[in-house]
């Protein structure tokens, strides 16, 4: 896993990017985007900035919750490889939903805590009850299973539902060895529809998006991809 503090770009040779024409084709013919129809949004450097942007929009009453998210990425950003998923299931879910979004207060609320980072911010958004449906458009060279299976409904994989669960009598790390018992006695969060699109051909939208967030993600992209966020055409 690449450090979030890393400033070194990954190799252009090892990670070839689409051409300008391929990018435009995906935007226009797969997402339904157009220069003629402007959609509000923001270009961010790191993925977790999206979470704070959403929070700002929600606080300004510009975005209603829960909302649907189409996440186009080579990574699910659902906490795989991060210890935060344990914090979320054991601690964050134990407090009212309206308190969970107060990230700046975690130091006062919890003895040990993690703040949203680039690889788990969507899991935090789920814990905030912001998302009603999550579509993960993964890298077509992968199978898109880079998530913590404990976040799925009943811990069953594969699954078209995400349902976080908090058990005050058991720890999240016990799920693997006591799966049925954990979920049988747990408090369940609202279900979230979960879909994984593994082929470019399966991506089909008509441009009906309220907001678009484009992330440069310098930690995980080669410099050759920077033209996408800088292009005016």
Predicted features, each with a name:
Residues 1-233:
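Conserved alpha-helical scaffold segments that buttress catalytic/binding sites
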């Amino acid at each position: 896993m690449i450090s979030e503090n890393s400033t070194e770009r990954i190799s252009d040779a090892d990670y070839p990017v689409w051409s300008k024409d391929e990018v435009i084709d995906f935007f226009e013919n797969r997402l339904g985007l157009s220069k003629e129809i402007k959609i509000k949004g923001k270009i961010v450097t790191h993925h977790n900035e999206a979470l704070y942007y959403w929070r700002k929009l929600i606080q300004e009453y510009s975005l209603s919750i829960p909302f649907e998210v189409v996440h186009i990425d080579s990574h699910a950003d659902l906490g795989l490889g991060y210890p935060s998923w344990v914090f979320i299931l054991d601690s964050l879910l134990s407090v009212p939903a309206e308190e969970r979004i107060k990230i700046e207060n975690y130091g006062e609320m919890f003895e040990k805590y993690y703040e949203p980072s680039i690889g788990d911010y969507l899991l935090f958004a789920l814990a905030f009850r912001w998302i009603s449906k999550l579509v993960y458009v993964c890298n077509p060279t992968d199978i898109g299973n880079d998530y913590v299976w404990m976040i799925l409904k009943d811990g069953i994989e594969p699954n078209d539902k995400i349902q976080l669960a908090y058990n005050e009598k058991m720890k999240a790390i016990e799920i693997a060895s006591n799966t049925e018992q954990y979920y049988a006695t747990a408090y369940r969060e609202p279900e979230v529809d979960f879909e994984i699109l593994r082929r470019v051909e399966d991506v089909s939208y008509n441009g009906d998006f309220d907001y678009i967030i484009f992330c440069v993600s310098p930690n995980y992209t080669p410099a050759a991809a920077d033209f996408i966020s800088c292009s005016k055409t």
